[in-house]
From Swiss-Prot:
Conversion of fibrinogen to fibrin is triggered by thrombin, which cleaves fibrinopeptides A and B from alpha and beta chains, and thus exposes the N-terminal polymerization sites responsible for the formation of the soft clot. It comes from the Eukaryota. Heterohexamer; disulfide linked. Contains 2 sets of 3 non-identical chains (alpha, beta and gamma). The 2 heterotrimers are in head to head conformation with the N-termini in a small central domain. A long coiled coil structure formed by 3 polypeptide chains connects the central nodule to the C-terminal domains (distal nodules). The long C-terminal ends of the alpha chains fold back, contributing a fourth strand to the coiled coil structure. The modification Pyrrolidone carboxylic acid is found at Q1. One of its GO terms (cellular component) is extracellular region. It is found in: Secreted. This is Fibrinogen beta chain. The gene is FGB. One of its GO terms (biological process) is blood coagulation.
Amino acid sequence: QGVBGBEEGLFGGR
């Protein structure tokens, strides 16, 4: 679910 810079989850991401 988007951790750090993965997708768009916990810390926003992308």
